[in-house]
């Protein structure tokens, strides 16, 4: 069995297996890859690779539309979203669609529209994917040079990179437009317990926006995950969108510098590995963001964060015992520290007990009770409102944790309450996907570097152990 030398010259990786499933131009004889190697067979067939990518986009959008409609069909307005296992409707709610004061759902029709639009879009993408995979030209270079490319063409590759950056920038600005002009977005910090509002006073100060990037990721600093007002989030999208668009234009107009030509591997598999690394980083950041941040991911829709549930429990029992006559300012706990209140390392008054580790928490239901030096004792005695008690009791019993024993002092009740927080799902899934994308990055980067160095040849199939074994049948 012979692999075409002309193809091998540009792609030095041979992975030879039996070529029983023959597809003209996509079989093992002509590509050096068996059917299960998927898109590797299309490395030099830009038209077919386009079909694969468009079809893949169709599958993604189909899932979004179908899952969206599934959630709408099962949605019960009387229960909070996070009690219903929803992962898509909370995103739409955060964007301000169908939501009234306090995060209450007043209209599910926008969610239905979103699902239908995604389904229709997926049909268009699916048709395009099938067309380009089966009927369209195998390669685009001859008939549509603008869409054609050769992997080694560094200038063309950076032009494609530039186009992608511009599209990402446009996406960032879509959120800005929604927040500024098209109905606004949901602000969990709005007075009176959260509401949809238009963002009027954008934060555009570079020292504030880029200050987040310079913060420590630990403790009370929290890097970009610590952002806690929408002005900063939307202003950050203005900066990000602008940088992406200007960077995209720059990459389209310029050619790679000499140091970049030398430092990077310029092959399809190398670009795949770079992309996987970038997506992996995005996954890990998203994991931390959805776990800790209750501004971009409002607790009204996603359920409380872990620290928030723990602090809510301390607050709930402080309220109860204060009513029973306890002096919460001076009561001593079993460790000799304050039972209800204590001081943080920097002197602020914070909740005592196991939840002391979460003293950094900021949440809309708790901030009104703070003074210049942390929790204000007189406010805790006189100013606690019924809505704060209700919300903290609700959050206390809906921690994003499932455990047989106490976790940070939170009542998890995993055997009594059939509840898994969307925060748990979204954090865990993004961590796991981020990890596997990172492994994929290492794999493809190693193969791409080996191919560039010219020493990867795959396994020698002539002396493979399985060939000397008795057939299974």
Curated annotation (Swiss-Prot):
GO BP, sorted A to Z: photosynthetic electron transport in photosystem II
N-acetylthreonine modifications at: 15
Membrane-protein topology: Multi-pass membrane protein
Tagged with keyword Transmembrane helix: yes
Spans traversing the lipid bilayer: 69-93, 134-155, 178-200, 255-275, 291-312, 447-471
Phosphothreonine carried by residues: 15
Prodomain positions: 1-14
Predominant place of localization: plastid
A GO cellular component entry from the record: chloroplast thylakoid membrane
Localization of this protein: Plastid, Chloroplast thylakoid membrane
Binding-site positions, [CaMn4O5] cluster: 367
Keywords assigned by UniProt, alphabetized: Acetylation, Chlorophyll, Chloroplast, Chromophore, Manganese, Membrane, Metal-binding, Phosphoprotein, Photosynthesis, Photosystem II, Plastid, Thylakoid, Transmembrane, Transmembrane helix
GO MF, one annotated term: metal ion binding
Family the UniProt entry places it in: Belongs to the PsbB/PsbC family. PsbC subfamily.
Function text: One of the components of the core complex of photosystem II (PSII). It binds chlorophyll and helps catalyze the primary light-induced photochemical processes of PSII. PSII is a light-driven water:plastoquinone oxidoreductase, using light energy to abstract electrons from H(2)O, generating O(2) and a proton gradient subsequently used for ATP formation.
Assembly: PSII is composed of 1 copy each of membrane proteins PsbA, PsbB, PsbC, PsbD, PsbE, PsbF, PsbH, PsbI, PsbJ, PsbK, PsbL, PsbM, PsbT, PsbX, PsbY, PsbZ, Psb30/Ycf12, at least 3 peripheral proteins of the oxygen-evolving complex and a large number of cofactors. It forms dimeric complexes.
Name by which UniProt lists this protein: Photosystem II CP43 reaction center protein
